[in-house]
Amino acid sequence: MPANTKPYSRLDMAKWVLQAEAIAQSKPLPPYLQTRLDAMREGLAEEIAYLQGAGKINNVKLRGASVDLSYLQQDSAAYKYNNAKAHWQLLNHNNNGYLYGDGFNAVGTLHISGSLSKDLAVGITPRFSWDKDEHGDASLIEGYAKTHLGVWGITAGRQPMSWGVGRAGQLAFGSNATPQTAIKLNLLEPHTFDNGALKFLGKANVNVFASRLEGNRVASSGSALEKDHAALVGVRVDIMPTDAFTIGLERMSMLKKFNKHWLLGDNADDAEKDNWNDIAGLDFKYRFPGVQVYASLYGEDQAHAFPCENAYNVGMYFPQLVPDGSWDLRVEAAKTNDAWYGHWVLKNGWTYKDAILGDWLGADAKRVYAEVNHYLADGGKLGLSYTWADMQQTAQHDGRLQEVELSYSKSLQKDLLLHTAVGYGKLRDDTSKLVAVGLSWEY
């Protein structure tokens, strides 16, 4: 089972394709799944050949391109949180910090990646957009170089990351905010505890990263106690006692400076001496026959070196509503308390470039999420999702939100994918309506 850390590398995905093909030798796949597996094999042909010892990975090239057109009719462009300097938008979550403009939106992306040698991989994904509010804009979703030193992978640059479990959102660190430029270390392969006292742990993977936040945090917060270019560091260990069970331990810290008190977890009671904001906790995923169960329990603060002011999410994924697996279902619930994502010294809160680094749900909130998907034999997919949330529950206004979205995707030809969506969202008396259509090419 993959660790609960994204993104996955192309080599990782190639290994999983080979594993799936080995399983399919004794247990034939249903048509819809075979179509998807064949498409992945074709897209990862060079990596698969390399793993089989029949080729080299010197393949930096254009991997894909996409054009997305959407029309958004909204009563409000964005909504603010009570205790964090950030905003969010109806029908637009976990989108790497990007907001839609009111009315017509056009977005184009190019994805270029590959390996310069067996020791160096690179990737770049520029994004070009236009809407009537911001007019034309160009940005970089990702741009990175990756190498290795012994058993460690080393990545430098910008790359969207998400840690933890949950489809609707991750509590500490997800894809809701703009990707950061960071240095990341990870084990290239999980460490196996073959013998000894720790054999019961099975396998373990480690991810570590460090980045800097934006340089205008003092001015935007209006507080001299804030820190421009504060550090953001994260450590995550995924332990896999069995192939069906993964447990993750995670600590994320927003730091004014490094010192022994942070290492030991000794919080200061004086605002002048409080130099960090932590989110830490654990999550797990267990795969039973016919259902996967996952949950998180994280603390936004600490008491005696242990997390407190807790939040949680819990979910169940049913991969086979019918015997061939062409229908699946996911249901989730999440809850945060009123301390989440805010801080008494770092006034901007748990944010980066006006978006929460964790779950868009925010503080003092709860959410129920459900989605059902039907996978078609030609590789297409039909999906329906529903979100109900009560945001900022103790605020004076009514924060109840409902969103429903219907999506459909279909392969028009070998390397061309059509994807469409319609959505409706409501918050108090405000509504938002979305119609989107896009084309993606894979090369």
Residue map of PLM features:
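Extracellular/periplasm-exposed beta-strand and loop segments of Gram-negative cell-envelope proteins
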Residues: 99, 111, 189, 356-361
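Signature for the C-terminal beta-barrel architecture of outer-membrane proteins
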Residues: 119, 162, 182-353, 363-375, ...
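Structural signature for solvent-exposed beta-strand/loop edge elements and short helix-capping sites
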Residues: 1, 9-29, 40, 160-182, ...
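Outer-membrane beta-barrel translocator/receptor signature
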Residues: 92, 102-108
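Short loop/turn motifs that connect adjacent beta-strands in outer-membrane beta-barrel proteins
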Residues: 2-4, 25-35, 52-63, 114-122, ...
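Outer-membrane beta-barrel "beta-signal"
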Residues: 410, 419-421, 431-443
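Surface-exposed loop and membrane-interface regions of Gram-negative outer-membrane beta-barrel proteins
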Residues: 99-104, 116-149, 163-176, 305-306
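N-terminal periplasmic/intermembrane-space "pro-region" immediately following the signal or transit peptide
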Residues: 1-98
